[in-house]
Amino acid sequence: VELDPQRETTALLGSKEGIFHLTQACLEPGDVVLVPDPAYPPYRIAAEWAGAEVFTLPLRRENNFLLDWSTVTTDVLRRARMLWINYPNNPTGAVAEREFYKDAVAFGARHGILICSDAAYCDVAFDGYIPSSILEVEGAKSTAIEFTSVSKTYNMAGWRLGFLSGNAEVVAAVRKVKSNIDSGIFAGVTAAGEAAFRGDQSWLIERNALYARRRDLVLEGLAAIGIIAQPPKASLYVWAPVPEGWTADAFATEMLESTGVCFSPGTFFGEGGEGYLRISLGAPTARVEEAMRRLRNWQTTPPASPRPA
């Protein structure tokens, strides 16, 4: 991917900040934003803060949790200004290939919709898998932008450093909003980020192998209590179905109270997350091992009320 550093990319105080500034720069009250469900909550919240309407697109297991915009009605398309995509995905761990991004760019160009790709987990991948970027697609910069973050790539969560790249007009609009809200990034943080980017990248292979080991520990622990989850190719999460007879909230609460193990109920990420848990791979390996040991020792019966469909 080639970018004009003066026009087609800008630094952010973390990509989350950029999500909110993007919506302030590009949306008007009454505009529609197409948001996945389940999804990272700031996509929806930032749109609502800008006065926009949110139209959700369900991520379905039978479609490998890939967005399908074919069902969006003509009326919604006329008012739609943004579409959020996020692969490797939070919370599902799903990935998207180059053809998906080609279709997304074509969809955005056809309907005048800005395609907003959140690629925070683009460098957290396993078993030789290499995630694609939407900006690799020819013509993408005419209708797309991409967020990246040092938080996940370089283990720098809390340093608050990210980037927005792609469409030059959108980059300029975000810079204008930012110039009225913040005064830039601390020089020490930018120096650390530059050192991370310019330094030896081979350690990322070892780091990702560590995440893959934790992923396998989680999958084995879940299988021991009858939960079969799809092994993610990338991201920091395992997206696991809850046992029959449980809701996401009820099972997460049961795990916390009975075993002391904390999982995120899928409903935190939207109604489409019902029936699932998000399990993070960010804890130390020894803690993951202990959590799975406790999971294996858990014995109880499901509640009387069935899990909602």
Q: What residue ranges belong to the model's regions?
A:
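PLP-dependent class I/II
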Residues: 1-309
